[in-house]
Amino acid sequence: MSALETQNLGMVPVVIEQSGRGERAYDIYSRLLRERVIFLVGPVNDQTANLVVAQLLFLESENPDKDISLYINSPGGSVSAGLSIFDTMQFIKPDVSTLCMGIAASMGAFLLAAGAKGKRFALPNSRVMIHQPSGGAQGQATDIEIQAREILKLRESLNGILAERTGQPLEKIRADSERDYFMSAEEATGYGLIDKVIAQRA
């Protein structure tokens, strides 16, 4: 959900800061962005991807040597939108630390695993789920065949990246993602999707 959508629902708290020059009001997400924290909440789509990518690029321009934190609570969504976030995470200079709070499913789990090695975390009661990409092919038989070939290529690409990010054999990733494969935070650690379960700040 974008900040604009949550504002329309009247759900975004405002933080008032005092300074020598008076008061300044921030919505909570803008205030946390100043602390280099980005939220990916809700479905992964073109709109949320554009917001996350813009924030990643902005924070890199602010300080290319300081880590960025990406907090994830997402059921997944569009593969192309998720890959735009993934590619930007790898492209920028700062390490991106990921943290699952709630659920990281499908593309959410993929982005959780995309964080910098050693800096991928989950809160204790988080859930993580991987599966193969789904498609809604329509049209003439030839169109459906083209779309089917594309989704199979995407599946192999995603499986290869997950195998590299987790250290699991490609065949295991293929088998496990054939259907919805749910994991607890501890199981996701053992699987290599994250590096550590954290219950409290250090």
Swiss-Prot record:
Presence of the UniProt keyword Cell membrane in the record: no
GO molecular function terms noted in the UniProt entry: ATP-dependent peptidase activity; ATPase binding; serine-type endopeptidase activity
Pfam family, one: CLP_protease
InterPro entries, alphabetized: ClpP (IPR001907), ClpP/crotonase-like_dom_sf (IPR029045), ClpP/TepA (IPR023562), ClpP_His_AS (IPR033135), ClpP_Ser_AS (IPR018215)
Subcellular localization(s) per the UniProt record: Cytoplasm
GO cellular component, one term: endopeptidase Clp complex
EC number: 3.4.21.92
Active site: 106, 131
Gene Ontology terms describing biological process: protein quality control for misfolded or incompletely synthesized proteins
Primary location class: cytoplasm
Keywords: Cytoplasm, Hydrolase, Protease, Serine protease
Catalytic activity: Hydrolysis of proteins to small peptides in the presence of ATP and magnesium. alpha-casein is the usual test substrate. In the absence of ATP, only oligopeptides shorter than five residues are hydrolyzed (such as succinyl-Leu-Tyr-|-NHMec, and Leu-Tyr-Leu-|-Tyr-Trp, in which cleavage of the -Tyr-|-Leu- and -Tyr-|-Trp bonds also occurs)
Stretch forming the signal peptide: none
Subunit architecture: Fourteen ClpP subunits assemble into 2 heptameric rings which stack back to back to give a disk-like structure with a central cavity, resembling the structure of eukaryotic proteasomes.
Family classification: Belongs to the peptidase S14 family.
Described function: Cleaves peptides in various proteins in a process that requires ATP hydrolysis. Has a chymotrypsin-like activity. Plays a major role in the degradation of misfolded proteins.
NCBIfam families recorded: clpP, PRK00277.1, PRK12553.1
Annotated protein name in UniProt: ATP-dependent Clp protease proteolytic subunit
